[in-house]
Swiss-Prot record:
One of its GO terms (molecular function) is monoatomic ion channel activity. It comes from Influenza A virus (strain A/Goose/Guangdong/1/1996 H5N1 genotype Gs/Gd). The chain crosses the membrane at residues 23-43. The record marks H37 as: Essential for channel activity, possibly by being protonated during channel activation, and by forming the channel gate and the selective filter. This is Matrix protein 2.
Length: 97
């Protein structure tokens, strides 16, 4: 019996769905997949900025500064900053970590 042939019958307190296939493993699996899909979609919409920012920028780190003296690190930061400074009134956002 397909889901389109379900019959709803009024009872004393509520509407009840008479469906003989509700214990079918395929129906149970489809219900579980549907619920998981809904949960994942809601989480994606709530945290999409965090998730996609992590995927976009989290995997692309700058050059490693391990073992480099602090003076050279500061010099590198200043070079990077001066390379993007524009005197035309344009603004450039730089994220230094």
């Amino acid at each position: 019996m397909s889901l389109l042939t379900e019959v709803e019958t009024p009872t004393k307190n509520e509407w009840e769905c008479k469906c003989s296939d509700s214990s079918d493993p395929l129906v149970v699996a489809a219900s579980i997949i549907g619920i998981l899909h809904l949960i994942l979609w809601i989480l994606d919409r709530l945290f999409f900025k965090c998730i996609y920012r992590r995927l976009k920028y989290g995997l692309k780190r700058g050059p490693s500064t391990e073992g480099v003296p602090e003076s050279m690190r500061e010099e590198y930061r200043q070079e990077q900053q001066s390379a993007v400074d524009v005197d035309d009134g344009h603004f450039v956002n730089i994220e230094l970590e």
